[in-house]
Amino acid sequence: MTTNPKPAYQRILLKLSGEALQGEDGFGIDPAILDRMAQEVKELVELGVQVGVVIGGGNLFRGAGLAEAGMNRVVGDHMGMLATVMNGLAMRDALHRAYVNARVMSAIPLKGVCDDYNWADAIRELRQGRVVIFSAGTGNPFFTTDSAACLRGIEIEADVVLKATKVDGVFTADPVANPDAELYDKLSYAEVLDKELKVMDLAAFTLARDHKMPIRVFNMNKPGALRRVVMGEAEGTLINSDA
């Protein structure tokens, strides 16, 4: 049962990890998971919520990992950006099959594949009810897709950045390694930094903090969790300036 008859947010930026798409295979894209995520996004669109999406590329390629093995970091990051484009195209296709209008915008030009990122075009598409998938990160090496999510969220004036993870939110410790770890309902930006909690990388988190962009961390694998978050129900961990 929802606590609010209307969505708590009008416009959101949903950050999905590439790993979330790979399922149990450990690599690539699981079509069943992709379709489920598309259906959950469709629910939000039907509620009248404007949805921007950023997807990581870790299910296909990780530039940082190969950089450690000797590859030039800039080259590796460029390859990682292209992986996020592939995930974005897959998500757009899944949304189209679910009868949801969606566009992929890339931070690096890929003529004939997807649209170039343009702030004004993105806002217009969102207002018209289309899902906008922001790919290729920020277009620059050395920045994560979490940074891209916060940047795009700020640019499109989203009400919140929703970071989808494999756990129920932010815990006092790693809940996988420590079953006694407790879930935080709310945190301030300062508390996250003071407690050295791993929400996202420091550059991304600082960007969100400086622009007072709320972040909610939740478990995308939990059925209905995304809808509950958007409806304002107690789900996951909310991070803002006055938690």
Curated annotation (Swiss-Prot):
Organism domain of life: Bacteria
Binding site for UMP: G57, D77, T138, G139, N140, P141, F142, F143, T144, T145
EC nos: 2.7.4.22
DNA damage keyword on record: no
Top-rank EC class of the record's enzyme: transferase
Pfam family, one: AA_kinase
Main location per the UniProt record: cytoplasm
InterPro entries: AceGlu_kinase-like_sf, Asp/Glu/Uridylate_kinase, Uridylate_kinase, Uridylate_kinase_bac
CDD domains: AAK_UMPK-PyrH-Ec
Functional pathway: Pyrimidine metabolism; CTP biosynthesis via de novo pathway; UDP from UMP (UMPK route): step 1/1
GO CC aspect terms: cytosol
Protein role: Catalyzes the reversible phosphorylation of UMP to UDP.
Entry protein name: Uridylate kinase
Taxonomic source organism: Vibrio parahaemolyticus serotype O3:K6 (strain RIMD 2210633)
Originating gene: pyrH
